[in-house]
């Protein structure tokens, strides 16, 4: 969707997709807008509650079955395990993705890791293709005039023309670009708290080969799961940047995370969007 600042200002229904790395402020902004008549569509929440709900539960049950006491209760239907995924608690999704490496340290085999990556990829594609339906639900069913699509950090990795076409046709795409300070903070955060991530398979294969050669490892089972995530995150971050930039160039607009940090209301966000439209060629 391409708009001039004047056209955006006149919209009675604003529909926006936020893109960017996890930690740049997408969910912070979405939560703020949610309090001011915006419907918050969380891609990760949709993934966890609709498309990966059963695999997530199966994974939890598989872990529980390793505990004799819980195994007996599960096999006799004496207990029930449910997902408690909320927009503010998406831990079950990242826990399902898992980390590659030594099983004694909670790591997954390469085969299992890639299986889960593939499931997540398909789930994210479907969650983004659901956006038009939820735009209608938000307005007709729930009465929200505006819609914010809080897309996952890995949307740039999907390589799905259909997803980009759908988002560009139905929403204004805004890429939140990390400032240099924000970039350092995100990398430092990954060092402190390495979390499961989605990788394109070609990227994973290339970086895994480099990592294992650099650590002089023969088998994936020798990998320290957290060490690999710490090592690979800066490479992933830099690999995603040109992908985000290409999406913004072809389909949307860019704002800086430092600009986003200055706003505290939907009105201020609207001004920021208009500024982005103006500086990127719309008049």
Predicted regions and their residues:
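Hydrophobic anchor at the beta1->P-loop junction of P-loop NTPases
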Residues: 18
């Amino acid at each position: 969707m391409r708009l001039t600042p004047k056209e955006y200002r006149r919209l009675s229904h604003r529909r926006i997709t936020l893109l960017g790395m996890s930690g740049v402020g997408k969910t912070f902004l979405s939560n703020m807008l949610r309090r001011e008549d915006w419907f918050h569509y969380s891609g990760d929440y949709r993934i966890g509650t609709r498309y990966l709900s059963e695999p997530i539960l199966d994974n939890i049950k598989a872990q529980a079955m390793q505990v004799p006491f819980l195994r007996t209760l599960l096999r006799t239907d004496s207990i029930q395990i449910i997902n408690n995924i909320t927009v503010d608690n998406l831990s079950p999704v990242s826990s399902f993705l898992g980390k590659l490496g030594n099983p004694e340290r909670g790591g997954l085999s390469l085969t299992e890791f890639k299986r889960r990556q593939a499931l997540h990829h398909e789930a994210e594609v479907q969650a983004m293709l659901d956006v038009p339906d939820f735009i209608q639900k938000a307005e007709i069913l729930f009465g929200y005039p505006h819609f914010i699509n809080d897309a996952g950090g890995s949307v740039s990795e999907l390589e799905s023309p259909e997803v980009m076409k759908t988002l560009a046709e139905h929403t204004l795409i805004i890429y939140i670009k990390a400032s240099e300070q924000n970039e350092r903070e995100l990398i430092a955060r990954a060092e402190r708290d390495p979390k499961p991530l989605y990788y394109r398979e070609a990227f994973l294969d290339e970086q895994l080969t480099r990592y294992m050669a650099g650590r002089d490892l023969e088998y994936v089972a020798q990998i320290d799961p957290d060490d690999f995530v710490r090592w690979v995150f800066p490479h992933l971050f830099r690999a995603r940047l040109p992908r985000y930039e290409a999406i913004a160039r072809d389909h949307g607009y860019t704002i800086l995370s430092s600009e986003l940090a200055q706003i505290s209301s939907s009105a201020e966000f609207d001004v920021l969007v208009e500024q982005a439209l103006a500086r990127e060629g719309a008049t």
